[in-house]
């Protein structure tokens, strides 16, 4: 599907639909929230299955610890809150109570990144991927759009061990409807568009911007491969190494700090396996601020033009 024909949808209703599907078919599914059921997408589940939903109020640390206890009895628990609250505030509980015993707690973090807009720096979680991918036994997933969010939730329910799923607040382009995107598997990246001159690696809402950038580059006779890196940990190293060797240069794009985010994870793979020019498009080492989402994306360098410029830069450095 071309960028000009994309529909825009929020990801949280997709999370809600997936929870309802799981609730109707699997009695071991339990959901927890922290005073934000309507905002994060767990409200419908709480109404349909009140005996399997727990609202902990503004007590995220208690939520995660209790979810670990519930999971230790054989349940599969989905815990959800804003990304700022269910990562940094509860890091000790995630590490000690969830990851160390490798329990089936799935943390769905909403309102991630700077696209929460006016909520400002205190609510703009831009370092969560760095925190979560550092934890042993933690799997990290960042869906590109609503359809992929639904698939990711369903896949997480079947995946053994802790899973962190990051989604945003804003409406995002529905870009994963092509035939190559029908099958979703945790740990597997998807080639969204083939190309020979440069590889654009996107995650989350930046996948759509990578596809738009590829369209712009094509106008200048630059053939860009686009990879949707929906799983940040474990990385699909094979597809990244193959792309690096075949195109000779890579640009990564993420709505996250460049410090230890997806781009850093990709760089670690390349430095050991395929030395090619690389450019990371992401949020500089700084906090966010209040503003309209599009204005913030422009200020922090997360636009289609930034990706296009990055592509021209790595192609020039590659020297062919």
Please annotate each region the language model reported.
Residues 1-166, 171, 183, ...:
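Thiamine diphosphate
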């Amino acid at each position: 599907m071309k960028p000009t024909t994309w529909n825009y949808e929020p990801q949280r209703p997709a999370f809600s639909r997936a929870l309802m599907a799981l609730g109707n078919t699997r009695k071991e599914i339990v959901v927890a929230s922290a005073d934000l059921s309507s905002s994060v997408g767990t409200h419908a589940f709480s109404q349909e299955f009140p005996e399997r939903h727990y609202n902990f109020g503004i007590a995220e640390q208690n939520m995660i610890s209790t979810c670990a206890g519930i999971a230790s009895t054989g349940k599969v628990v989905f815990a959800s809150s804003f990304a700022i609250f269910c990562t940094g505030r509860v890091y000790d509980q995630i590490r000690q109570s969830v990851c160390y015993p490798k329990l089936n707690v799935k943390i769905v973090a909403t309102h991630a990144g700077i696209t929460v807009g006016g909520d400002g720096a205190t609510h703009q979680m831009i370092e969560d991927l760095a925190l979560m991918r550092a934890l042993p036994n933690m799997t990290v997933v960042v869906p590109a759009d609503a359809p992929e969010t639904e698939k990711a939730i369903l896949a997480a329910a079947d995946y053994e061990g802790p899973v962190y799923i990051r989604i945003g607040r804003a409406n995002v382009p529905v870009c994963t409807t092509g035939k190559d995107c029908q099958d979703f598997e945790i740990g597997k990246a998807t080639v969204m568009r083939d190309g020979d001159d440069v590889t654009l690696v996107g995650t989350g809402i930046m996948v759509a911007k990578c596809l738009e950038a590829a369209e712009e580059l094509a106008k200048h006779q630059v053939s860009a491969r686009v990879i949707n890196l929906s799983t940040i940990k474990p990385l699909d190293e094979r597809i990244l190494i193959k792309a690096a060797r075949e195109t000779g240069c890579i640009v990564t794009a993420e709505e996250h700090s460049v410090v230890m985010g997806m781009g850093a994870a990709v760089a670690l793979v390349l430095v050991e396996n395929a030395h090619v020019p690389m450019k990371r498009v992401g949020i500089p080492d700084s906090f966010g601020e209040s503003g309209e989402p599009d204005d913030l994306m422009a200020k922090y360098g997360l636009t289609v033009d930034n990706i296009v410029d990055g592509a021209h830069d790595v192609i020039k450095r590659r020297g062919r």
